[in-house]
Amino acid sequence: MALQPESPGQPASTVDPAEIAKFSKLSAEWWDPTGRMAPLHRINPLRISFIRDAACRKFERNAKSLSCLEGLRMLDIGCGAGLLCEPFTRLGAQVIGIDPSATNIAAAKLHADKSHLAIDYRNVMVEEIDPRERFDIVLAMEVIEHVTDVGAFLSRCAALMKPTGIMVVATLNRNWKSFALAIVGAEYVMRWLPRGTHQWDKFVTPAELEQHLNRLKLIVTEQSGLVFNPLADRWKLSPDMDVNYMMVAEAAP
């Protein structure tokens, strides 16, 4: 998406500079660790390490290697502006990031271009991915609480996994604690998220998620909660899955 200088014999660029400016502003917001996306930036290192370590255990890689995911195909569903796509590309994975928001994809492409990273970003829904495409790692991070049919969505995700692949899902538990912290606390008190970002009745309990996965002949191999410590102002992995949690699933033997 970079603008090229006009030269004799070269047609003028058809890219609208105003659009570039708009996408640049959005990209800066997504990637500003102190701005509106600060909560996501705080939790992102934990998501990255959890996914990386799970993948390295599955595929017998050295998690300390800077190219530990080399040769692995990864699909990030609902990728936003690429906060997961970029670090996993740097670790060697061949990453495809998809998002139904054209604006998010434009911002993601712009930031990847500035970072000199080759990432295949697509403005599509998971249902539009060619079923012949298969991936070693399928990510559905903070997505299922926004879909209309969790079972159908996960079925489509599972269909895109290689037989030896893994799926990593992150979402929010459904209980009064998650209502108090993820909605009242995050959206109304702390104002980390715009009001209305989440609907509590669309949250998914760990038992429900595991049931969906089991119906698809997948088994949960790893799971972890993510807990925020307000005194330390940081997130940590925890056995406590009352609010935020992640699961790794693979094909049942």
Curated annotation (Swiss-Prot):
Pathway where this protein functions: Cofactor biosynthesis; ubiquinone biosynthesis
E.C. designation(s): 2.1.1.222, 2.1.1.64
UniProt keyword annotation of S-adenosyl-L-methionine present: yes
UniProtKB keywords: Methyltransferase, S-adenosyl-L-methionine, Transferase, Ubiquinone biosynthesis
Pfam families: Methyltransf_23 (PF13489)
Gene Ontology MF annotations: 2-polyprenyl-6-hydroxyphenol methylase activity; 3-demethylubiquinol 3-O-methyltransferase activity; polyprenyldihydroxybenzoate methyltransferase activity
Enzyme category, top tier: transferase
Protein name per its UniProtKB record: Ubiquinone biosynthesis O-methyltransferase
Gene3D superfamilies: Vaccinia Virus protein VP39
Name of the gene encoding the protein in the UniProt record: ubiG
InterPro entries linked to this entry: SAM-dependent_MTases_sf, UbiG_MeTrfase
Phylogenetic placement of the source organism: Bacteria, Pseudomonadati, Pseudomonadota, Alphaproteobacteria, Hyphomicrobiales
Family note: Belongs to the methyltransferase superfamily. UbiG/COQ3 family.
Biological processes, Gene Ontology terms: methylation
Substrates-to-products reaction catalysed: a 3-demethylubiquinol + S-adenosyl-L-methionine = a ubiquinol + S-adenosyl-L-homocysteine + H(+); a 3-(all-trans-polyprenyl)benzene-1,2-diol + S-adenosyl-L-methionine = a 2-methoxy-6-(all-trans-polyprenyl)phenol + S-adenosyl-L-homocysteine + H(+)
